[in-house]
Curated annotation (Swiss-Prot):
Alphabetical list of InterPro entries matching this protein: KRAB (IPR001909), KRAB_dom_sf (IPR036051), Krueppel_C2H2_ZnFinger (IPR050826), Znf_C2H2_sf (IPR036236), Znf_C2H2_type (IPR013087)
Full protein name: Zinc finger protein 425
A Pfam family per the record: KRAB
An annotated Gene Ontology molecular function: zinc ion binding
Species per Swiss-Prot/TrEMBL record: Macaca fascicularis
Sequence ranges assigned to domain KRAB in this UniProt record: 1-69
Length: 741
């Protein structure tokens, strides 16, 4: 193809300094090359201009043509160079020629030149001799350069040719057509991408360039900008008083207030405010997700969604807060964050008056008042207000724990649990009470603690008027009043607060239990559960703690125990500040403050705070004592009672007093002993003020005031206040029986 490269005055101004230097060097190199080959021609004007330091651009009236292809260095007989009006142009090898060198070849020289070329090249040359002399040229564009092609060759009229690159010479792009940004020189293969990229430049940047000002778009935009700068935002929304320059922008905005959704989905009847949103939604029904992540394979409907997702892998956070320099991955995340600095919360809940910075957050909050729970679990049927809560709940069924601690490789189901765990490694408690400077891992725990200082209890019970600091405590308390409203199990009389939990519980009774224990006859649905149960009878403890060599029957018990070595107690009581290693321990502890006793004995209606206490109590009614000592045959209702009893035979006393080095086999005995050193008597009689070390001593003392004698002899019917007195009395009857015989 025939290409002639030249620079106009405007283009010469756009060129960078290094590009101008390269152009000058290229021109000098080409001139020296021709001169060394012995060509007879006068010095071109371009070289003269460079020596004189003049501007090196060509007026747009100048006509530059492309030369023939160079085969071998021509001789003086083949070319007779004229010294008329030399203008620079390039062949496909990048060699400098002049218009007369290539266009004004005399008759015999033309024949010699044609003879020196191959047949194909000779045909091309003969077909285009008239073209080189023709002044009628048509211009088209490639990025930042102008290319002249011959109008007399109709087959090549729309062809955009880019010569191949030559080392050390001016580079002209090759391959498919490219589109260049004239502000930053970035190149794009698709015109649409270039238009999108231009939006990243401010209008002030674009208006600096003559090429932009000369385009119709630039002129219209300049006129529009000047018009907008000279006028105010005349179109104001009557609802929120927001103003706009254009009426069309106001009409688009008002759809938000009217609630109008004129674009319905034909598949699911969902409606949309804008047609573009409907088109995106239809891609979901068609299953079209054309934008795929190369890292994890996840597919998206829109390119912008993929772009946002890729920042997860790259860690890029391009949006920075101007107030605190905090960075965000998404622009909307930064907008939400900015509302914290401004303090603006324009969206108010009509039910409770709570304010929100986003309308979407208000809508989600209103579900708490309407009790709408649109997200349900397919496994257990439990429903949730928020989708993120459903996603977290599903991990309970799948067992997935995607958040791993880099320090100890421990995994967590929730990200916030990992954050709280990480604070234990660092020892930081980021939330401090301003009153007493006490630290907390959680903001909610600190807020609940602050209510203790202010004595604020904003949550009253509707039945009895008792007030609580937290809604969770109120919920626990209301169970006492609502026991008749609970859902009881017809098989075992167990009650549940929700129908879904009762349904889940009924599966225990309805399913078969083919695996039975040979010792006690208890049945299980799974063999693994039976295996774990038999360890109670055999005393097998296969799981050993690597820290203290203590053994356990279950792996979960060992993990639970290991937290004690790590001093890991992430669950804190907001009332008294006591910490626990497990959530269930905290739940049981909170019942001390609320006074709740949710477990009731069906035989005597006695209530208990802990489920384990109820189970032990039921064994008294049934008379069962499943845990027997192999040494003396004594039986116990609970495992820990047997463990304490075995220490009597072994002589083990693991609990030692730090004051007097006295040792005990039971932890409770050590606690009572420590009161003797401190002088504390925690259990006081409300009648006479007398103090006692143990609770059972106080109960026995209260019988003196009430006159009650709960312990009676079966032989003679005599009653006693203390169980010890009854045992002494029974021994008297035992001694009398042999003598009477």
């Amino acid at each position: 193809d025939d290409v002639a490269l030249y620079f106009s005055g405007q283009e010469w101004e756009i060129l960078e300094k290094w590009q101008k230097q390269m152009y000058k060097q290229e021109m000098k190199t080409n001139y020296q090359t021709l001169d060394s080959l012995g060509y007879a021609f006068s010095k071109p004007d371009l070289i003269t201009w460079m020596e004189q330091g003049r501007m090196l651009f060509i007026s747009e009236q100048g006509c530059l043509d492309k030369t023939r292809r160079t085969t071998s260095p021509p001789t003086d007989e083949q070319l007779d160079m004229k010294d008329t009006g030399k203008l620079p142009c390039f062949d496909h090898e990048g060699t400098l020629r002049t218009k007369e060198e290539d266009c004004r070849l005399n008759g015999p020289q033309k024949q010699d030149l044609g003879a020196a070329l191959p047949g194909k090249e000779r045909k091309i040359l003969s077909a285009r001799r008239d073209t080189f002399q023709s002044p009628s040229l048509q211009e088209t564009e490639i990025p930042n350069k102008k290319v002249s092609i011959t109008a007399s060759d109709p087959d090549k009229k729309d062809l955009r040719h880019k010569p191949r690159e030559t080392p050390g010479r001016l580079e002209i792009p090759t391959g498919p057509r490219c589109y260049s940004c004239y502000v930053c020189r970035k190149v794009f293969q698709v015109r649409r991408d270039l238009l999108k990229h231009k939006r990243s430049h401010s209008k002030s940047q674009l208006r600096r360039y003559p090429k932009y000002r000369n385009t119709s778009r630039g002129k219209s935009e300049l006129r529009r900008t000047q018009r907008l700068l000279c006028q105010k935002k005349r179109f104001q929304c009557s609802e929120c008083e927001k103003s706009y320059f254009l009426k069309g922008s106001l009409v688009t905005h008002q759809v938000v207030h009217t609630g109008q959704r004129p674009y319905p989905c034909p598949e699911c009847d969902k409606t949309f405010r804008y047609r573009a949103n409907l088109k995106k939604h239809l891609c979901l029904h068609r299953g079209e997700r054309p934008f795929c992540c190369g890292e994890c394979g996840r597919a998206f409907v829109q390119q912008c969604e993929l772009t946002e997702h890729l920042r997860l892998h790259s860690g890029e956070k391009p949006f920075q807060c101007p107030q605190c320099d905090r960075c965000f991955r998404l622009k909307r995340g930064m907008k939400v964050h900015l509302s914290q600095h401004s303090g603006k919360r324009p969206f108010h809940c009509p039910e409770c008056g709570r304010s929100f910075s986003r309308k979407a957050a208000l809508k989600t909050h209103q579900r708490t008042h309407s009790e709408e729970k649109p997200f349900s679990c397919d496994e257990c049927g439990r429903k949730f207000i928020y989708k993120i809560k459903l996603d977290e709940h599903i991990r309970v069924h799948t067992g997935e724990k995607p958040f791993s601690c880099p320090e100890c490789n421990k995994s967590f189901r929730l990200k916030r649990s990992l954050k709280a765990h990480g604070l234990q490694h660092s020892g930081k408690r980021p939330f401090q009470c301003p009153e007493c400077s006490r630290g907390f891992f959680w903001r909610n725990a600190m807020r609940a603690h602050q209510r203790l200082h202010s004595e604020q209890k904003p949550f009253p019970c509707a039945e009895c008027g008792k007030r609580f600091t937290r809604p969770s405590k109120l919920a626990c308390h209301t169970r006492v009043h609502d026991r008749q409203k609970e859902f009881p199990c017809g098989e075992c009389k167990k009650t549940f607060s929700q129908q879904s939990r009762l349904t889940q519980h009924l599966k225990v009774h309805n399913t078969e239990k083919p695996f039975s224990c040979a010792e006690c006859g208890r049945s299980f649905r799974r063999r693994a559960h039976l295996t774990e149960h038999t360890r109670l009878h055999s005393g097998e403890e296969p799981f050993q703690c690597p820290e203290c060599d203590k053994s356990f029957s279950w792996k979960a018990s060992m993990k639970f125990h290991q937290r004690m070595h790590r001093d890991e107690k992430p669950f804190a009581c907001s009332e008294c500040g006591k910490t626990y290693t497990h959530q269930s321990q905290l739940t049981e502890h909170l019942r001390l403050h609320s006074g709740e006793k949710p477990y009731q004995c069906p035989e005597c209606q006695k209530t208990f705070r802990l489920k384990g206490n109820l189970k032990s109590h039921l064994l008294q009614h049934s008379g069962q004592k499943p845990f027997s000592c192999v040494m003396c045959g004594k039986s116990f209702t609970q495992q820990y009672r047997l463990t304490e009893h075995i220490r009597v035979h072994s002589g083990e006393k693991p609990f030692q007093c730090p004051e007097c080095d006295k040792s005990y086999c039971i932890r409770g005995s050590l606690k009572v002993h420590l009161y003797t050193h401190s002088g504390e008597r925690p259990f006081q009689c409300p009648e006479c003020g007398k103090g006692f070390l143990q609770k059972r001593s106080l109960k026995a003392h209260l019988c003196l005031h009430s006159g009650e004698r709960p312990f009676s002899c079966d032989e003679c019917g005599r009653s006693f206040t203390y169980v010890g007195a009854l045992k002494t009395h029974i021994a008297v009857h035992a001694k009398e029986k042999p003598s009477s015989l």
